[in-house]
Amino acid sequence: FIAAKSLLPEVDFILDIGGQDIKCLKIHNGCIDNIFLNEACSSGCGSFLQTFAGILGYSAEDFAKIGLFADKPVDLGSRCTVFMNSNVKQAQKDGASVANISAGLSISIVKNALFKVMRPSRPDDLGKHIVVQGGSFLNNCVLRAFEQELNLEVVRPDIAGLMGAYGAALYAQERRKLHPQDSALLKAEQLRTFSHTVKSVTCGLCSNHCHLTVNIFADGKPYISGNRCERP
């Protein structure tokens, strides 16, 4: 939300389709008013497209480019990956081109988001200033399918797949202005001289006899892993 608002201050709806989930944010008066999420199934997300691209022998990028030249996108519905796989196989048997299958899958992602997550009565219900983000929207075929389905234009940032990280950075920057303090991150010189030693020990403080990995840093502070209790 912070990233989208920085790029489009009047944003009133955000759709984020990532690799495994769909997030929809309704904005009112500059604040998040409502949030919609997809169910446990990851169908209709980026991994869904990537899976079928691999099955058909294409990279995700090439599969997306091919879909832009579809003349008759296949109607594949918006079912889960298992059922969609059979639909794609049937489309291949019927002679559908890879371009039309790619476009059909992109449309199914959009329909899944619209009719199973957002469920608007009409396009105007979403808002007038819509930002779409998440790695899935780097696929121009998905972007175009969304715009055609709603018959409107939306804003897709060039860093669509990094909007979460960008928003976190903006938030950290703002917090630093309010509460100035030195960063806990190591500086470049500290990284160049960074060193630590590792040793393995067996703890004898209880009957678990945990095999521990002990990292000891230059300042003498240890970091212990491998324990099965809270003793270390």
Where are these regions (language model features)?
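Active-site nucleophile and cofactor-binding loops and adjacent substrate-binding regions
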Residues: 1, 15-19, 36-44, 104-107, ...
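Glycine-rich phosphate-binding loops at beta-strand->alpha-helix junctions
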Residues: 108, 121-149, 160-161
